[in-house]
Amino acid sequence: MTVGRAINCAKLCNTAVNPPVKPLVFANFLAPDMTPTYADVAARVGRALGVPAQLIEGSGWEQLRDGSVDVAFLCGLPYVRLVGERPGMLRPLVAPVLDDARCRDQPVYFSDVIVRRDSPFRSFGELRGRSWAYNEPGSFSGCLLVRHHLLQLGETEAFFGRLTFTGRHQESIRQVRTGEVDASAVDSQVLGVERLRDPALAGELRVIESLGPSTIPLVVATAAVRNDAQLRVRAALCELGSDPVSRNVLASGLIRRFTPIDDRAYDDIRQKLAIVESAVPSG
């Protein structure tokens, strides 16, 4: 009985001396179809670092501003906006290299313009006056890049007929697939993952044009994470590509590996954002 009490006391003492380790909180601010892949990635990084890790769905940029999230999977457009608002609040860690021959082993992706396979459209120019689905205004591949493309053609959004905002790439894909809209531009990674999960999709949709390449959405650390921990997270993410089991996990998200990335890589998005914003009439 005395021994039992001593063991319990030791456990209590150990708990007091070694308080529970704070979990490493990852958040997915990208398409929900990437959540299973990124949840597994987060768990593997946690195991590599010897800390508990969890993935949550990102619900608002305040999570990045206040540091309630440690690491985030984030689109390049909100990234450049947020660091423009407060330099240093986010640190680029890595970006995925996709298993897509068009990407040429670089951290880039495309905005694929999709239509139904049985539609008559063969090029972006043939979509004049047709119904179009944007993702949402904060999406680079699903909105801003299309607006930039229209400007390069000397056009405005009046080029399209009816415009809708779907709120996510998967919904844009669904609406094109069902014929609710004629066309949309979607993240090439999301489209690739949807094709992996639903092979019938490839027979129902066609890509008539690809905008890009553009620097791909990235993984960032918030200011809540110490510099040494940021470096360890970056290294753990990069090492996933050298482990056969982890490579299978990455493949479910069409990812070949993660590679280090820096802020300058997103200058292409900054430039396109500046062009689009300068074209918006003031007042």
Model feature map: region roles:
Residues 9, 21-28, 32-40, 228-283:
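An extracytoplasmic/periplasmic, membrane-proximal ligand-sensing/linker region
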Residues 28, 94-103, 107-110, 199-235, ...:
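Periplasmic-binding protein-like
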Residues 65-125:
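Acidic, polar ligand-binding/catalytic clefts
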Residues 1-20:
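N-terminal amphipathic/basic-hydrophobic helices that include classical n-h-c signal peptides
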Residues 23-48, 58, 76-77, 105-172, ...:
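Bilobed "Venus flytrap"/periplasmic-binding protein-like clamshell domains
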Residues 73-87, 152, 177, 182-202:
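A ligand-binding cleft/hinge motif common to bilobed small-molecule-binding domains
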Residues 144-147, 151-156, 165-177, 202-204, ...:
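Hydrophobic, well-ordered secondary-structure segments
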Residues 60-65, 78-79, 171-175, 181:
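Short, hydrophobic alpha-helical packing/hinge segments within bilobed ligand-binding/sensory domains
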